[in-house]
Amino acid sequence: YEDGTPLVLLGDFIIHLDKPQAADFNTLLASFDLKRISTTATHKSGNQLDLIYTRCCSVDNTLVTPLHTSDHFLITANLALTPEAAHTPTRVTFRRNLRSLSPSRLSSVVSSSLPSLSQFSALDTNSATDTFCSTLTSCLDNFCPLSSRPARTTPSAPWLSDVLREHRSKLRAAERKWHKSRNSTDLSVYQSLLSSFSANVFTAKTSYYHDKINNCCDARTLFKTFSSLLNPPPPPPPSTLTADDFAVFFTNKTRTISDQFSTLQTEDNFTTTNAHSFSSFSPLSETDISKLILSSHPTTCPLDPIPTHLLQVISSSVIPSLTHIINSSLHSGTFPSAFKQARVSPLLKKPSLNPALLENYRPLSLLAFIAKTLERAVFNQLSMFLVQNNLLDSNQSGFKSGHSTETALLSVTEALRLARAASKSSVLILLDLSAAFDTVNHQILLSTLRKMGISGTALQWLNSYLSDRSFMVSWRGEVSKSQLLATGVPQGSVLGPLLFSIYMTSLGSVIQKHGFSYHCYADDTQLYFSFQPDDPTVVARISACLSDISSWMNDHHLQLNLTKTELLVVPANPSFHHNFSIQLGSSTITPSRTARNLGVVMDHQLSFTDHIATTTRSCRFALYNIRKIRPFLSEQATQLLVQALVLSRLDYCNALLAGLPACTIKPLQLIQNAAARVVFNEPKTAHVTPLLIRLHWLPVAARIKFKKFALCK
């Protein structure tokens, strides 16, 4: 309620205003800007026990009337609300009724509506793309036009059928009849209807949960389904923010960072440091395009001409046209202008944050599915060239085949453990960048690509891909004005992470120059080095390295956020303590006892006790939520949920726990035991070994060993 929403707080507070405790109570409410409405005595004893507090609204004509039916008096008042507070405009959503749509009919209509292949091939890239998208949209509009309806303001109960709603109406009528008559016969009828209705609702909920969970194709979908079933999204909080407010805020946030850096001088001559070159993309066959379309996850956004799952169903009728668009784009070095638009949805970072503040939102960028299909075609060829010629940083694990956050953490952790075994202390520094993907300078990125040997239409295509991009914000049914993007790699794109990895390639040489080792995962960079415990040059070396990194960041238009950069000191032995801080400009970096690194809580003793405690808490909360709906779940559905929401957490980066004593990992084993009991709906005292055998679950210690062997293979 921090956004100025009118608020009235009233009731029997059982507080005597003439007592000292009342002063503290009034001070507390005043801190929330609540003001008390003065009245006469509200109790027959002459005290004011029934109180009214208001905020952002006025109350007049307050009247206290003794009714002689209670010790408390009746209080009436007029509540004056502002027009904005009294009337909140109804939100409207737009949907299509796709249930009645026949995909085969849509496919035939699209085939007949698209120009012939000879006519389509004569169109340039942008014209062909516009024609293709407009044809798909118009065909879908003919079958399923958009219809508007008021948005729901209450949580839905999707398992309620028309029969159950009719049954509920009869139940409520019987309840009212019994309350009115107080007749035993009416009570029996009401109780019978209540028992029958409860049983039918239980059956309907069980069937609904079972179908929803069994239809989930992967862990991510299962997690979203589980969250939506357990905690339906609440109605959006009242807010005066508009889509244009968000668009301007997101644009200015990036522009403020970019404006801090000096303007680059255009270079006329670029020297290619790579002996190999990549000047053009190879054309794709219709079979290649079909594989790209059908193998991709069917994500849909408002920019798609038709829902992606429909596009995949009718793909056979549109593949020839799509093949021309993609090959024309690759051949001409032109990225279609229609695909340069992004649709951004603001998401509140945490439910507890004030929804009236723009800085509490993060942008979620959505791109058209066909645009990402074209990006995948480029990604496959570009990444193959980079890998074959060893042009990517070997210490970059982000979005690379055979690498993950776990391999990145293993590399760093093993180095720290080996240093401790050699009686050396170590320093681990976790760098934090502000809006790193959004501030990438296109001129520097293209220069880096040239030096790697990328030229010709391939470089021209990448230049076209980066330039003239824009976005619009969708917020509560309205769309903002378009905002241009002068910097950055597209968020939510296929190529964005790869291009950012290329952009960061030269940072490694700056770090290694100071004798530091490093490892990266996308924009998360961790650098570390080991030293003798009595080395007096440690602080100077760290300061010099961070200073050069900061200079490199400035030269590459990236902002190093020193306030969020973390420093972890791992001593040579538990009894040794290093007490120092790093001063860089006006910022001071002090060592932390723990630091979160790629989702793992690391501590200065490498005991991982804090990480195990954090994992245990999150798993217990997940099990608690699963138990809430366990009566409605089958054994198979429960097992799916537990494996996706609990075991996945136990297994995340569990190779880091290899070698820890059994007492340290025991809390994780207790979680697995509890999970097995939830699957079979057994009590807490049930023997767990037979349950684990029936589930074919390895114990936690064995899972850690198995993961270690799998990664070393």
Region spans (language model):
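Arg/Lys-enriched, amphipathic patches
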Residues: 6-20, 82-236
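Short, charged alpha-helical motifs in flexible N/C-terminal segments and linkers
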Residues: 155-252, 282-326, 331-334, 417-425, ...
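Basic, alpha-helical interaction scaffolds
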Residues: 100-141, 586-657
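Short, conserved micro-motifs composed of acidic
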Residues: 41-55, 62-63, 279, 477, ...
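Surface-exposed loop/turn segments and immediately adjacent short secondary-structure elements
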Residues: 82-86, 109-112, 119-127, 132-138, ...
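Active-site palm subdomain of RNA-directed nucleic acid polymerases
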Residues: 1-7, 378-396, 419-421, 497-530
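Metal-dependent phosphoesterases centered on the DNase I-like endonuclease/exonuclease/phosphatase
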Residues: 1-58, 108-115, 119-123, 190, ...
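Conserved pre-catalytic core of RNA-dependent polymerases
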Residues: 250, 279-490, 529, 640, ...
